[in-house]
C-alpha cells in the first residue's frame, strides 16, 4: 500500500537559551493510508515535534516531507509551499490536542462551525465557492451526530465533561473532511473510562471514514487499544518501529520493553511473587517459568505436551490471553518440576517451538 505520509531523514533544530537543541534527529517514518499509527515516547522524546512537521506547524531543519504523493518540504531542493496553498493543505489534516482549545464563548455547534468559516467546495463548473449557511448547518449537524453530541449542540464548553469537550474537538477537526487526523496526547487529560470511550470513537471514525490516524502518546495502553503500527522515540530519534503485533511479540529496544511492561498484568503478578507465602521457596528440582505465546501457538497444547514428552510436572500459577489486532497473545507463569535433564529438554522444546520464555528462578520471600 502507498504511504500517505513520508517523513524522510527529518531533523529539527532550534536555539534555546543560547544553545542549539536537536529535537528530532534523522527520523524516517512512512505511514500508509488507513493506518492508525502510534508514536510513543516519554516527555521530551521529540514525538510531538516530529508529528507537527506533517502539516508544517513545525518546519524541519533538514530532510524531506511527502504527503499524499506531494512534496511539501525538501531541504535539498526547496519547495514553495506558503500562503493559500499551505492553508488549503492544512485543512486536509485535522488535529486534536490534550487541552481541547474550544472557544468558551461559543456553543458546541458554533465551535464546530468555526472550522468551516473559510471552507470552500467546487461547484458543478469546477469553480471554488464558500459554503452557504445551510450547507454549514447541515455539515455541523452531521458531525455532531457522528460524535454523539447532537443533543448538546446549544451547550457551552463550561457545561461539558472532559470527554464531551474532546468529542467537540474531534468534530471540529473533521469539519473539512481531512484524510489525516493527528491526535497529540488527545486522551492524556482524561480518566481511564473516558479515554477508552474516546479511543472507541476514533476507531469507529477510522472505520466509517477511512481516515488515517496518527496518535502521539506516552501511554502504551493507548497504543495497544487502537494502533496497528508503532514507532518508539527516545532523545529525538526513532529507535524502533514495527507493526503492533511484532512490537509486542518481539520488542528489541529496552525502552520498548519498558513500555510494554506497563500494560502487562503478568509483570505485576511476577513482582508480587516475592511476597507470596505459597512460593516462598521452590524445591531443588523446580523452576519458575514465564512463558509468552501468540497466534497459532495458543491452539497447541504446549504444557500438556511437555508433561507427556519429558517426564516433568507443571503447576500453573498465572494465565492470561488477550487480543491485539484480532490476534491472541497469552502469558503463563508455571513451575516446571523434574530432573535437570528433563527440565532442560522441556525448555529446549520451547525454543524449538519458537516460544518466548524466561526462567524466573527461585522466589525468595521478602520482608517489608
Curated annotation (Swiss-Prot):
Q: Superkingdom of this entry's organism?
A: Bacteria
Q: Where in the cell is it found?
A: Cell membrane
Which keywords describe this protein according to UniProt? Amino-acid transport, ATP-binding, Cell membrane, Membrane, Nucleotide-binding, Translocase, Transport
Q: Give this protein's Gene Ontology molecular function annotations.
A: ABC-type D-methionine transporter activity; ATP binding; ATP hydrolysis activity
Q: Which GO terms describe its cellular component?
A: plasma membrane
Reaction(s) catalyzed by this protein? L-methionine(out) + ATP + H2O = L-methionine(in) + ADP + phosphate + H(+); D-methionine(out) + ATP + H2O = D-methionine(in) + ADP + phosphate + H(+)
Query: Which Gene3D superfamilies does the protein's record reference?
Result: 3.30.70.260, P-loop containing nucleotide triphosphate hydrolases
Q: Which residues bind ATP?
A: 41-48
Q: Which InterPro entries match?
A: AAA+_ATPase, ABC_transporter-like_ATP-bd, ABC_transporter-like_CS, ACT-like_dom_sf, MetN_ABC, MetN_ABC_transporter-like, NIL_domain, P-loop_NTPase
Q: What is its main location?
A: membrane
* Catalytic activity, EC: 7.4.2.11
Name the membrane topology term.
Peripheral membrane protein
What is this enzyme's class at the first EC digit? translocase
Q: What are the ABC transporter domain coordinates in residue numbering?
A: 5-260
Q: What does this protein do?
A: Part of the ABC transporter complex MetNIQ involved in methionine import. Responsible for energy coupling to the transport system.
Sequence similarity: Belongs to the ABC transporter superfamily. Methionine importer (TC 3.A.1.24) family.
Assembly notes? The complex is composed of two ATP-binding proteins (MetN), two transmembrane proteins (MetI) and a solute-binding protein (MetQ).
**PANTHER family (alphabetical):** AMINO ACID IMPORT ATP-BINDING PROTEIN (PTHR43166), METHIONINE IMPORT ATP-BINDING PROTEIN METN (PTHR43166:SF30)
The entry's protein name is: Methionine import ATP-binding protein MetN
Record the organism.
Lactococcus lactis subsp. lactis (strain IL1403) (Streptococcus lactis)
User: Its encoding gene is what?
Assistant: metN
